[in-house]
Amino acid sequence: MFDYFYGQSGEMFSYFRLPKILFRDIKFKDLSTDAKTLYGILLDRMGLSVKNGWLDEQGRVYIIFPVQEVMDALGCADNKATKLFRELEKFGLIERKRRGLGKPNLIY
């Protein structure tokens, strides 16, 4: 349970950033809150990919975030995690590139 915040104490936590456009633009009205949350997590991962120099041959930053990690992060089942990825793709927020051979997808 959290206590009250005093002074600068609210800054001791780390946060996921969610673009306001996901909540304000009519085209994202039907995007689920869970998908918006996942998008914030993916954006956070994008920063790590930049630091690690994860670029494809065209210089685009990608992330690797397997379904299992989504399940762990959001406390959901496999089918829900897969549905959230599809939802983000449908709204044009991510693109997944399949690599095959049991390797996780690259996410742009």
Could you tell me what each predicted segment is?
Residues D25-L31:
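Short amphipathic alpha-helical boundary/capping segments
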Residues G7, T33, R45-Y108:
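Winged helix-turn-helix DNA-binding recognition segment
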Residues M1-R24:
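An N-terminal low-complexity regulatory-tail signal and nearby short nucleic-acid-interaction modules
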